[in-house]
Every structure is written in structure tokens, then in C-alpha cells.
Design a protein with these regions (language model features):
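Conserved segment of the helicase C-terminal RecA-like domain
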Residues: 292-303
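A short beta-strand element within the Helicase C-terminal
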Residues: 262, 266-279, 301-303
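Conserved RecA-like ASCE ATPase "motif II neighborhood" in helicase/translocase motors
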Residues: 1-12, 258-260
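Conserved Walker B
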Residues: 21-29, 262, 279, 293
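Loop/turn-to-beta-strand initiation segments
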Residues: 13-16, 53-59, 251-255
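Conserved helicase ATPase motor motifs in RecA-like P-loop NTPase domains
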Residues: 21-29, 40-75, 85-86
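Conserved interdomain linker/interface between the two RecA-like ATPase lobes of SF2 helicase motors
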Residues: 56, 65-176, 200
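Conserved motor-coupling elements within RecA-like helicase/translocase cores
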Residues: 75, 90-121, 188-256, 267
Length: 303
């Protein structure tokens, strides 16, 4: 049959734009995004028959509402309405309710370390040593239940601070966990990288391909039949006796150091231990970064 051609008007532009993770669009990134938003809004706007402009509605989610008015004005040039509004009981906002902490819902525990009169680097080394050695002790006693606390995630405000800690981990921390003090009560920690600590990094100075591999390896769990002190000593004895010790293709990370890149896109259920170095710049960083550990609160509470 013959086709019928009829003139049609322009398709109606989008009426709704949803922006997730608004709190991350700050600084240089916010400046660049603000320029693109002008073009997006122009292409998404239209006029009624009487010439009245109609712009799309923008709904944005953010981890903090602090300075939200200034941020929205800078990005979109608009006024902002915040919801849910302030309520009388912060534990019940109608949209969300606070879950009480009990054995079934242990939540996350935040512990602050006040190291007055001690250099920050010394405090980092000492705390990292204790956390890594304690993880090995837990693995020897509890087996697979200790896996979430065998990988130490370090969070830093700047790459410069992270680079310094990366050097300390492979030097000072490595030496301390390999030779714990006799009165410490901690066993020796053999790293998963041929006896050395296996260290990963999530920063902008790492190639994209390596970041993908690091994220994949974050899901590798410690095996009580391979990583406990008894299992390690058994492999060493086999090697000395001329036997071929057991091996594995990929090894889990002992330490992962990260900057703000950790806040988004990292959803690894097994992680349960984080060391936050210094004071994060805002509340959103506390929420986003620390929520990367303890994502399975019923079985792996975060510390």
C-alpha cells in the first residue's frame, strides 16, 4: 500500500532530569558540569503557544544539604526546594527510619584515634600495624568470619598524603607486621604477595585498566586453609622438605589505599575495615567513604 506522509511537530523535550550524587559535583568538576548544564537546559526547554518558556524539572539527590542553595545556583542558576523537610524526630523522617542497633543490625562502629604529641605519619604506621596484625589474629581464631577485617582500606584527602602512606606500608608497616613484638600478642602477618603485603591503589594516578583489575581483586576473600598462620607454616615446611606447596592464581589485597575515587562505584560486600586519615573535608565524605565498608551489616559489620 502507498505510504501516507503527514507533517509532524517537534517531539517534546524531556520534562524531568534526575541528577544523582550531586555532592560530588564540586570544584573543577562543578565548573565543567555547569557549562554543560546550560546547553542541556537550552535543548530541553520549549515554549507554549503563548510564548511562555517551559524548563525541565531537576531532581537531585545528595549526601548532604549543606550549602545546597549555593551549589544549585552555581550549577543550574535555579532556586532549590529541599525534601524531606526538617522534622521533630531525626530518627523518623517519614521517608526513612533509623534502625536500632542490635545483634541482627550491628551497624558500623567509628573509633577516633587522638595521637597528641605524635607525628601523623607515626600514628598512621602504628595504627595500620595494629589493624593488620589484629586481622591475622582474628583469622587464626575465627576463620572465614574474619575475612572482612583482613583487607585494610585507607582513605586519604589528597594524593600527596596517600603517596606518603604507600611508602610507609611497604617499608615501616611491612617490617613491623613481619616481626611483631613478643609482648604484643599478635602473630606474624605474612602478606599475600610472596610474603610481602599486597597493596592496591584507587587514585587518579593509576591507569583505568589497573583500576578495573583492582576493583575485581577487592572481591577476593582470604582462605583460612591458605592464609592462617598454621597453613602458612605448613607450606613453608613443605617447601623446605622439597615438596611443592599449594598455590593460587590470584591473591587478595592486604591493603588498599584510596582517595575520593572510593566514594562512588565501589560496592564490595566483603570489606569491613577502613582507616580514615585526617579530617574529611565535609560530612558527605564521611557518609560516602565510610559506607564502602560494612555493606553487609548482618554478616560483616563495618569498623
Amino acid at each position: 500500500p502507498a505510504a501516507t506522509v503527514a507533517p509532524v511537530g517537534r517531539l517534546r523535550p524531556p520534562d524531568l532530569i534526575i541528577q544523582d550524587e550531586l555532592h560530588l559535583i564540586t570544584g573543577a568538576l562543578g565548573t565543567a558540569v555547569g557549562l554543560f548544564e546550560v546547553a542541556v537546559e537550552t535543548l530541553s526547554s520549549w515554549e507554549t503557544t503563548v510564548g511562555a518558556p517551559v524548563k525541565p524539572l531537576i531532581v537531585a539527590s545528595t549526601a548532604t544539604v549543606r550549602n545546597a542553595q549555593e551549589q544549585v545556583r552555581g550549577l543550574y542558576g535555579r532556586q532549590v526546594e529541599i525534601f524531606p523537610p526538617q522534622v521533630l524526630d531525626v530518627a523518623d523522617t517519614f521517608f526513612s527510619q533509623e534502625v536500632p542497633i542490635d545483634d541482627a543490625n550491628p551497624g558500623r562502629r567509628y573509633i577516633g584515634v587522638s595521637a597528641q604529641g605524635v607525628r601523623l605519619s607515626s600514628a598512621e604506621i602504628r595504627v595500620s600495624e595494629v589493624l593488620l596484625s589484629a586481622g591475622q589474629l582474628l583469622l587464626d581464631k575465627a576463620g572465614a568470619a574474619a575475612d572482612p577485617y583482613m583487607t585494610l582500606v585507607g582513605y586519604f584527602n589528597a594524593t600527596r598524603e596517600l603517596a606518603g602512606m604507600a611508602r610507609y606500608v611497604v617499608d615501616d608497616v611491612q617490617s613491623r607486621v613481619n616481626r611483631p613484638r613478643k609482648d604484643s600478642g599478635f602473630p606474624r602477618r605474612w602478606g599475600t604477595s610472596f610474603g610481602l603485603l599486597n597493596v592496591g591503589e584507587l587514585t587518579s594516578r593509576i591507569a583505568s585498566s589497573e583500576i578495573g583489575q583492582t576493583l575485581d581483586h577487592l572481591g577476593l576473600e582470604f582462605d583460612p586453609d591458605y592464609d592462617t598462620t598454621a597453613a602458612t607454616l605448613a607450606r613453608i615446611a613443605d617447601a623446605r622438605a622439597g615438596k611443592k606447596p599449594a598455590s593460587r592464581k590470584h591473591s587478595p589485597f592486604d591493603v588498599v589505599l584510596a582517595t575520593s575515587m572510593l566514594q562512588v562505584g565501589v560496592d564490595v560486600q566483603r570489606l569491613g575495615l577502613m582507616l580514615v586519615v585526617g579530617q574529611p573535608k565535609n560530612t558527605a565524605e564521611y557518609i560516602q567513604a565510610s559506607s564502602r565498608v560494612g555493606r553487609d551489616p548482618s554478616a560483616r559489620p563495618g569498623l
